[in-house]
């Protein structure tokens, strides 16, 4: 079984072409931002050693930058629920955590307790 820890990032009221009312719930997964990759061909051992020393510092600086906190948002699931379905699901709000489980051809979504 695969389990995804999702975060609700938006909740919007929308209408379909027939006028039926739905609540659109967008869920993302936050993943760690990969560190910078050094692409170089160093025949020189001194250059290679310098890169091994510098790369951890560069990675730390990139993760400390204010634009994302070292994480990226990966869209995972969008739900279109009626008012009744949302009530049965449990009222979720922006910032709430939901668990998405995938197993044997089934996808289960539930708010984290």
From Swiss-Prot:
Query: Which one Pfam family would you cite for this protein?
Result: Arcadin_1
| Entry GO terms, CC | cytoplasm; cytoskeleton
Does the keyword Cytoplasm feature in the UniProt annotation? Answer: yes
UniProt-listed InterPro entries:
Arcadin_1
| UniProt keyword Cytoplasm, yes or no | yes
Name the UniProt key words of this record, in alphabetical order: Cytoplasm, Cytoskeleton
Question: How does it associate, per the subunit comment?
Answer: Forms probably oligomers. Interacts moderately with crenactin.
* Miscellaneous remark of the record: Belongs to a conserved five-gene operon within Thermoproteales denoted Arcade (actin-related cytoskeleton in Archaea involved in shape determination).
Protein name as it appears in the record: Arcadin-1
Question: What is this protein's gene name?
Answer: rkd-1
